Amino acid sequence: MAKPPAAENQVMRVGVLTSGGDAPGMNAAVRAVVRTALDRGAEAYAIYEGLQGLIEGGTSIRQMQWDSVSSIIQKGGTIIGTARSAEFLTRSGRKRATANLLNAGIDRLVVVGGDGSLTGAQLLYTEWPELLRELLADGSVPAGIAASFPELFIAGLPGSIDNDIPGTDISIGADSALHRITNAVDAITSTAASHQRSFVVEVMGRSCGYLALMSALATGADWVLIPESPPNFDAWQQKMSSVLRDGRTIGRRDSMVIVAEGARDRHGNPISSSEVKAALEEHLQEEVRLTILGHVQRGGAPSAFDRNLSTILGSAAVTHLLHAQPGTLPQLVGIRGNRAVITPLHECIGTAQAIAAAMNSADYARAMELRGSSFRDAFRTVRTLVRALPHAPQPGRRQLRIAIVTSGGAAAGMNTAVRAAVRVGIDQGHTLLGIADGVQGMIENRVSELTWMSVNGWAHMGGAELGTNRKLLAAADYAAIARTFAAQNVQALLLVGGYSAYRAAHGLLQQRATHPEFRIPLVCLPATIDNDLPGSDLSIGTDTALNNIVDAVDKIKQSAVASRRVMVVEVMGRYCGYLALMSAMATGAERVYLHEQGVNLAELQADVQALASGFKQDKKLGLLIRNEYCNAVYDTRFMWRLFAEEGRGVFEARYAILGHLQQGGDPSPFDRIQATRLATKCLDYIYEQGQQAEPAGAFIGLRAGQVQFTPLEQFPSMMDAVTARPREQWWLALLPVMQSMAQAGPRSAQNASL
């Protein structure tokens, strides 16, 4: 165990532990905590085996160095171990934990775990002063140590695949678990369709339906059962079977039911997946397969999102602790709208307890309310999408002819957005029209009606089934488009795509005086891997591309480390460096080159020298990630040749241009969910504007976690005309975090040696 620092020259010591069920991304959090603490001049300690290690002390509390957390960001589980500790639930156990922290000189603690672990941390904070007095009284700790550490400062990080922790949009591990579930359900779907078979899939989540609900939304499941909203009638088995039977009647070849492990009926009785299977077999008179995914949801490498989430939260937690003043309450460090936020831990625990109380008393409306608006919206959307057939049109409700076009480079999630728009629109009584091959299809009148079943199976399909291209409209094109709109009686237009889609929509808006056919609701939904559109923090397709990059780079690293190589990896993004920066953070790259920051020869020379120095000290791998347009002169091959020549005899150099694999693949769960969410909101906006005498044009986006519509008129002023990227890019604020993680060692040590 560490010796406490001398009081007169006290160095802050930060401890980190992972507790409860493991979650992918915990290693990235540990790495961020350790490196941020060291970089700020503090000492870092890992408490092995969770809260139990805190009780046992001794070798369970170990000092960490910079290299102690090298090459762990891509690993699943937690390298410092975790455990559920029954002893910590006792006062005597917490007293031992307090003594061990005091004797190690640790009064700042980062706890990565679920609600049980965070509740335990809150209790330890509350009891600290009294336990301190008891330890002084029985001589377990010296008086000097007790005087130096009168308070315990705690930062909790939400680490749970269940995503059941209030105070954060999503917890560490939940996105990775969704990847496991959607991959499994996608695979099951292909065999189910081959045999025209029904499947029941049970997913984790305990008493939270997040994983079940979001995986149902992402996979296009036909029915879902979650704890927060049980079936509101007793004969739910017959209703579920009827919906699945109707789906087969209209042409579906398979049926998929997703069941949360905590599912219940409206009386609070558990609904097991085996009970669902038996009900389907009874009412459908067919053989039904049951798959319980189990711990495959918890294991494996973390997704790109979880790696970056954990890094951001771990860094923010240490920053908070090092600036904590006397009297600072324990805080949960979570994410809201892509920004780290802190919330008093006791408030988060109180909300979690309120949700549990609401569910135990069968107040499910209250439970849904406490889960948040995004959860409620997702549930309402799923209820529409699982229908075998749409509702009958409502009397008196205006019915519109809404055209949909995909434009720009292909982005995973385009098909998901189109599917959601078509089914939600038809369910509202509208007629949906598909325009083939992007804006060229508008010019050539390549329009056809889309039905409920036209988009069957599109939820998980990559690419763009309607066809897309990057064509920019010329002045002569508008008259042809006006003729198409008149011939097809187009009364609203939804454009799903990138820069060319936004340019087209803005052009149509400007042409309204000349062509009255364009005086209709115009809405753009951001879908591009480049994430270079205004009005939205993230575009559909970006998360999938980022995961494609991270998967490829993980493999490249395994190859490079065996041969002591420097790898220069080029990623897409045009003039926007989002993919480069976020993939660099997620893969642990040493350097990232962005067009926003520029690249010069002096920097490249410094990078060569730093790499050579590292390899001489037994470094095994150098990873450099560059945006494709970061510098036209110092391109990827130039950098490769430079590093190869200057590193001769010390390291080898190779380059990899990842290319169009970044655009391919089935959409990630995040892209599927956001595409569905945004498309649904677009349909609401279109109907609202369709009632106006002069309908507006807008582009939708997620900004700071909220869905917002921005007037199309603002599009040119929000874009840089030269680079065709937004003037404001929120993610650049994360560059210092990535750079601090990528250093060869802490700046505090470098400064001390000067």
Predicted regions and their residues:
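Short, ordered loop/turn segments at secondary-structure junctions
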Residues: S19-D22, I47-G53, R84-S85, G114-G116, ...
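C-terminal non-catalytic interaction/assembly regions of soluble proteins
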Residues: S272-G396, W640-L754
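Accessory alpha-helical/coil subdomains and C-terminal extensions
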Residues: A44, V111-G113, T119-F153, S171-L290, ...
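N-terminal phosphate-binding or glycine-rich loops at protein starts, especially the Walker A/P-loop
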Residues: A2-G58, G396-I443
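Short glycine-rich or small-residue beta-strand-to-loop segments that form or flank ligand, phosphate
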Residues: R13-G21, T78-A83, D107-G113, G156, ...
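Glycine-rich oxoanion-binding loops at beta->alpha junctions
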Residues: A2-A7, L54-L109, L118, I161, ...
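Short glycine/serine/threonine-rich phosphate/pyrophosphate-binding segments
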Residues: A23-V33, L54-I55, L89-K95, D115-Q122, ...
